[in-house]
């Protein structure tokens, strides 16, 4: 990591899923001037979800991309600085913390919130991606409702399925 600091911020948020945008909303309301880097998939995993029926405030449901856009707009309304970029290196050994963005820009931050989310593990079988969200699911808790009273196959091991 370079010793050259390109920018100093009070609050740096890495990730733009529900946790990242929620952190940006609260940090903005607390006048922490948050800078949020969206990462490799702006909006996070929910952008690949067709229908979200279990999020409070949306009694008729909402698509994942629409929900994430609503959260992003709310964070922007409160003053969050949302940028595209990927955190490629971190030095969290001592405050202020140093985060390298896109292998080039070094940001020094008083506070770092890491909200990088999760990535589903798939089997890698033919047509699996083709049917993601249309029969192939990576979240039994999230999507089980859609398959009630239907014959399903659940694949997993240990405490995950």
Segments predicted by a language model, with ranges:
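A generic local structural motif
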Residues: 1, 21-22, 85, 98-102, ...
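N-terminal Rossmann-like dinucleotide/flavin-binding domain of flavoprotein oxidoreductases
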Residues: 2-3, 47-106
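Rossmann-like dinucleotide/flavin-binding elements
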Residues: 5-8, 13-39, 132, 138-161
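Short hydrophobic core segments
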Residues: 12-14, 106-119
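Short amphipathic alpha-helical segments
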Residues: 24-25, 48, 124-127
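N-terminal glycine-rich anion-binding loops that anchor highly charged ligand groups
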Residues: 36-48
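Glycine-rich beta-alpha-beta "Rossmann" dinucleotide-binding loop(s) and their flanking helix/strand
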Residues: 112, 116-139
């Amino acid at each position: 990591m370079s010793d050259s600091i390109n920018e100093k911020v009070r609050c740096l948020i890495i990730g733009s899923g529900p946790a990242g945008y929620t952190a940006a909303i609260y940090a903005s309301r607390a006048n922490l001037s948050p800078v949020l880097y969206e990462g490799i998939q702006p909006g996070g995993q929910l952008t690949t979800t067709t229908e979200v029926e279990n999020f409070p405030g949306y009694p008729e449901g909402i698509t994942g991309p629409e929900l994430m856009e609503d959260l992003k707009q709310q964070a922007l309304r409160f003053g969050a600085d949302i940028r595209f970029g990927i955190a490629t290196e971190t030095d969290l050994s001592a405050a202020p913390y140093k985060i390298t963005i896109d292998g080039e820009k070094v940001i020094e931050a008083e506070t770092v919130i890491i909200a990088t989310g999760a990535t589903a593990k798939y089997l890698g079988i033919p047509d699996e991606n083709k049917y993601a969200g249309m029969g192939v699911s990576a979240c039994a808790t999230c999507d089980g409702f859609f398959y009630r009273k239907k014959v399903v196959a659940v694949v997993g091991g240990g405490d995950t399925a």
